[in-house]
Amino acid sequence: MRLEHRGGALRGWEYHPASVPAAAGGSVLFVHGFGDSSIGPRQLFVQAATALTDSGLTVRSYDRLGHGTSDGRFADISIGDEVEQVVTMIRAFSADQGAPIHVVAHSLGAVESAMAAARVPDLVRSLTLWSPAGVVVDDIAVHDTIQGQPLAPVRDRGWFDFAGTALGRGFVDEVRDGLDVYAQARGYDGPVDVLHGTADEIVPVEYGRRYGELLSGATFTAVEGADHVWSSVPWREQLVDRLLERVRERSGR
C-alpha cells in the first residue's frame, strides 16, 4: 500500500477478513513507535492483525517517513510531522472504509495518535494506547537524554546515534521549544483504552496513567510485570483479547 504525504511515500500493508465484506466488520489502524516499523515491535501488530481479521475486521498499518520501507530519512523526523502523517492515515483509511476507524498505537506512536485523534475526532471511533511514551518530553527537556543516552553529542555534531541510525537535531529542538503532547491530545473525547506494563524499562507506568487521567473517555490498566514491547505470549494475548472486546463493544457487534 502507498500513501502520499508532503512529497514522500508512506508504505504499508492491509489485512482483510476472509468471510466478511470490506468495511462491514470495522477497521483498525495500527501506528508504530519510535524507530520501529509497521509490523510493530517483534511483530506485535502482525500477531494482533491475524486475530482481528479472523473476527471480521480490516487492518491497516504504515511505516512513517524515515522508517521501514517508506521514503525519507530518520534524521529528518519530527513529532509534529509524524502527527500529520497519522492524520493523513486516518483520513485515507476512514474515507476508503466509509466510516470512522479504530486507532491502536504503541509507544511514541501512541503519543502521536492521541494528538492526531484530537484533530480529526469524528473519524476516530476509538483509541487504544499501548505504553504511550509521554516520557519523551521529560527525557529530552529535563534529563537531556533519549532512552537513557546523553544528548550532548547532538550539540557537538548535530545528530544523535540511535542504535546505529542518525536522528537529527530538529527532533530534539522541537521538544525543547515547548512541545506539549498532553494539551494537544485533550481534544479527543471518544473512548480510549490505555494499557501499560508496570515493568516498562523505557516508559515508566506513570506516563500511561497520566493519559488515563487526562482523556475524558479513557480507562487505564496497569499490566503487572509487562515490559515496553510486551515480550511474552500471555501479555500479548491479554492485549489482543482486550482489544477485540473493546472494538466489538464500540462497533456494536
Located regions from the model:
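N-terminal cap/lid segment of alpha/beta-hydrolase-fold proteins
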Residues: M1-G26
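Short, surface-exposed "cap/lid" segments of acyl-processing enzymes
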Residues: A18-D63
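The alpha/beta-hydrolase serine catalytic core
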Residues: H5, L10, A116-A118, D122-R253
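Catalytic nucleophile-loop/oxyanion-hole region of alpha/beta-hydrolase
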Residues: H67-G98
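Short beta-strand immediately N-terminal to the catalytic nucleophile in serine-hydrolase-like folds
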Residues: V103-A105, W130
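Conserved catalytic-core motifs of eukaryotic protein kinase domains, centered on the activation segment
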Residues: G40-R42, S70-F74, V205-E206
